[in-house]
Every structure is written in structure tokens, then in C-alpha cells.
Amino acid sequence: MATKKRLGGFSKIHVAKLKADNTFETPIPVTGAKEVEAELSYEQVQFYADNAMDYSDFVFNGGEGTLTVSGLTMTEYNTLFGSTVEKGGVLVKSTDIAPELALLFERKKLGTQDRVLYALYACKFAPPTISAKTMEGGIEEETVELKFTVRELPAGEVFYMV
């Protein structure tokens, strides 16, 4: 029988802070998973000698992506962007330093009870755009798009899936 490999869904987002020793803290949930997209950039490298290509490879050159969620709590602002939670609100400063995080999530293998787990290492999130819409005869869902970058860890790890 063929192995099921079609995927669907997106759920159970967690983030884990990257520590100085390149290990991670305990993962923390981020609720309201809607969508994630990460584009990893690989630069083609080619060298020629004796009028012919004698080396060709692709080298990881970082990445970027977008995580879409239904909204953010004050704690999630603190976790993702390094913003300060104070006096019942969130204070975002130009001097905030967003921590590097592993972005963890799962997808279902269609037609099975199995799932695929993902860990994108060394992600850094930018605070979201502030936007609002008037209600014109109905309510439309408004989501929050979080842009992030991805880099490799010192041993070259970019992501893991199982």
C-alpha cells in the first residue's frame, strides 16, 4: 500500500526561545493558527575551469515568511517581539529587541490519524501592521499577519520535520 503523503490543515503553533548555547526553552503556545508560509532562499553557486562548469551547488541564503493568526494576546506580544506588558497593556518601543525563536506547528496527513510536525529554527518576528476596518452591514474576520525571518543555526540547521 502506498504511503499517505498529502497534507492538510495547520494547528498547534508554539514558539520556543533560542538560548545563547543554541538550545531552546520550553515551547509556549500561540493560539489562533490561520496560515503560515516560509520561503527559504538558496543561491546558486557555479564555478568554471577549463571552459566547463566544474562545481555547482545551492547555498542557503536565509529566508522569510508570514504567520497569520486570529489575533495576539499581550503575552504573545511580549514573547514574539520583546514588548513590555505593563499597566494592563502592551508598550511597544523602537528599542524593543525581538528574540530569536523556533516556530513549531503541525499539519495532518490526509486520510490518516498521523500528523507532520515542523520546527523552523532561528526565526525573528517583526511587530504587525496596525489596521482596522469599519463594519459595513456585517462583520468580516480580521487577522494579524506577522512577518518573520529565518536564519541557520551554527551547525547549519534550518528546519526539522517529522
Residue ranges, per PLM feature:
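Structured, beta-strand-rich domain cores
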Residues: 55-121
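Short, surface-exposed, charged/polar-biased interaction segments
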Residues: 9-10, 88, 141, 148
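Short amphipathic beta-strand/extended segments with alternating polar/hydrophobic composition
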Residues: 25-31, 116-123, 161-162
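Solvent-exposed edge beta-strands and adjacent loop segments
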Residues: 2-77, 125-140
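Short secondary-structure transition/capping segments
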Residues: 13, 115, 146-150
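Short, functional N-terminal and low-complexity linear motifs
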Residues: 44, 114, 143-144
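Mixed-charge, glycine-accented linear interaction segment located at domain edges/termini
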Residues: 125-162
